[in-house]
From Swiss-Prot:
One of its GO terms (molecular function) is rRNA binding. The lineage of its organism: Bacteria, Bacillati, Bacillota, Bacilli, Lactobacillales. PANTHER family: 50S RIBOSOMAL PROTEIN L9. This is Large ribosomal subunit protein bL9. GO terms for cellular component: ribonucleoprotein complex; ribosome.
Length: 150
């Protein structure tokens, strides 16, 4: 019996795959537990439509990520921070991914999720710093920060 997997099933198939499985296994396990549905011509057509829509959505997300990268790669795109500095040259507060994301939105109107900004630890130094940001699995950019003394 041909089925379309609705979820990943270890050793049998991944979500969206069409595979031939034993009839009893399909009816008694996969279909009952909503892990798969019977592959009729109508359900195969629905699956192809969903896959095309998903590909189109992924292409739009990739294009948006590339547009954000183009803005971040410009020399004039430098996020300005003014922080109070102690006698040892370190800032009193620290600059976190959340703060960087908010300032980027405020200064340039570019929205970047704070979870995409790759910071090993919060920034506490002054000067020019480049922070990597993973916009998409295929697109990585750098945010330029200019941290000055207030």
């Amino acid at each position: 019996m041909k089925v379309i997997f609705l979820a990943d099933v270890k050793g049998k198939g991944k979500k969206g795959e069409i595979k031939e499985v034993l009839t009893g296994y399909a009816q008694n396990f996969l279909i009952k537990k909503n892990l798969a549905k019977e592959a009729t011509s109508q359900s195969i057509g629905e699956l192809k439509g969903k896959q095309k829509a998903e590909e189109k959505a992924q292409a739009e997300i990739l294009a948006e990520a590339q547009a954000v990268k183009a803005v971040l790669d410009e020399d004039k795109t430098r996020v300005q921070f003014q922080e109070k500095v102690g006698p040892d040259g370190r800032t009193f507060g620290s600059i976190t991914a959340k703060k960087i994301s908010e300032e980027l939105q405020k200064q340039f109107g570019v929205k970047v999720d704070k979870r995409h900004i790759v910071l090993d630890h919060p920034i506490r130094a002054i000067g020019l710093i480049e922070v990597p940001v993973k916009l998409h699995k295929e697109v990585t950019a750098e945010i330029k920060l200019a941290i000055t003394e207030a």
